[in-house]
Structures are given as structure tokens and as C-alpha cells.
Regions:
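Cell-envelope and extracellular/periplasmic
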Residues: 1-195
Length: 195
């Protein structure tokens, strides 16, 4: 499966190959300051009107320049979370993993099963446990327009289902009925947690 996903690493390496590290750090500091101020404006919008729609928030606060400059501290670099977070907790004993992600991979839904299988394999290797339990929370329905096309999150859900049917000691928590069209994060946390 790695040959179909190797482009994530090569694209990143090409982007940073000739990067001036000092210039990158300067851009990163500027971005972090900008982002902190942008979040304050967004929080103020929601404090005034908790029911405000996201499009209106963007109209008032301006577009977000997220996710910031690409470089060695870029949170979405290949293996970024693995290197900055997962390795730190890997020595500790766990019974399993509850995995509730995939929203940002809707453009990769054709290979999401490979990405998820690789992730499970790597985590099991890291914890030295070929039987490490994985409970995958299936993405909810969020945008009915893309759902009709069979792309977007629908493709991710199909990949999540496939993985749970083909990889041992995995399970799937279905929450398709818990979505919210106006909020990417379902507000009904209790139902999701109970399942």
C-alpha cells in the first residue's frame, strides 16, 4: 500500500527542499501571532451570537490563513503527529485505540483504506502488539450535497467499514445519524460516547 501513499512524503520533501530555515521560523512566528488574533475575533463573534453561521463568521473576521507555513514544524507534514505526539506516549500501556478522524481526508477517499490500514499496522508495531484493539468512529453525515455524489465523507465511511471487515480486532462505531449540517463536529456528544 505504501507505493500509493508515498506521494504525501515526496510532495512535502519537494516543498521544503530549498527552504531557508530562518525565514521559515520568521513566517511561522508571524503566522502564530496572526492566528491567535484571528481566533480572538472568532470567539468574540460566537460570544455575541452563538447561533451565527460559519460563513457569516468568515465575512466578519476574514478568511483564516490556516494551516500556516509548510516546514519542519508544520503540523500536517507527513508523520508530524507521529513524531511530535505519538512517540511520546507509545511506551505507556494501552488496551486499544479509539480513532475518530478522517474529515480532512475527503479528497483522499480512494486511498483512505490504505492510509488507515497503514496507521493501524504502524501503531500496533509501535506498541509491540499485533492484537491492539482499534475502535473506529465512522464519520457522521455532514454535507448532504457531497453525500449524494458518493464522494467526500461517504467514501471515507466506506473505507472505514472495509477496514473493520478485513483487519482483525477492529470495530466500527456508526454515527451517521448524529451529524449536523451547520457544524462539522456533531453537537450530540453523549450519543457518540455511549455507542
Amino acid at each position: 500500500g505504501h507505493e500509493r501513499t508515498a506521494h504525501f512524503v515526496t510532495e512535502y520533501e519537494d516543498m521544503v527542499a530549498h527552504q531557508d530555515f530562518d525565514e521559515y521560523l520568521k513566517e511561522l512566528d508571524e503566522y502564530r501571532e496572526y492566528y491567535k488574533e484571528w481566533v480572538k475575533r472568532v470567539d468574540a463573534c460566537y460570544a455575541k451570537n452563538p447561533e451565527i453561521e460559519w460563513s457569516k463568521v468568515l465575512e466578519i473576521c476574514g478568511e483564516n490563513r490556516w494551516p500556516g507555513p509548510t516546514g519542519p514544524h508544520f503540523e500536517y507534514r507527513p508523520y508530524g503527529l507521529y513524531e511530535s505526539m505519538l512517540i511520546r506516549v507509545a511506551p505507556y500501556t494501552i488496551k486499544g485505540a479509539l480513532y475518530y478522524q478522517g474529515e480532512n481526508d475527503e479528497n483522499n477517499n480512494e486511498i483512505y483504506d490504505i492510509l488507515l490500514e497503514n496507521l493501524i499496522t504502524e501503531w500496533r508495531r509501535l506498541w509491540h502488539d499485533d492484537e491492539l484493539a482499534f475502535s473506529i468512529v465512522q464519520l457522521p453525515v455532514h454535507d448532504p450535497d457531497t453525500e449524494k455524489t458518493g464522494r467526500g465523507w461517504g467514501g471515507i465511511r466506506r473505507a472505514q467499514d472495509k477496514i473493520c471487515r478485513t483487519i482483525k480486532n477492529t470495530s466500527l462505531t456508526v454515527i451517521t445519524d448524529c451529524g449536523n449540517k451547520k457544524n462539522i463536529h456533531p453537537t450530540d456528544k453523549k450519543t457518540v460516547g455511549e455507542r
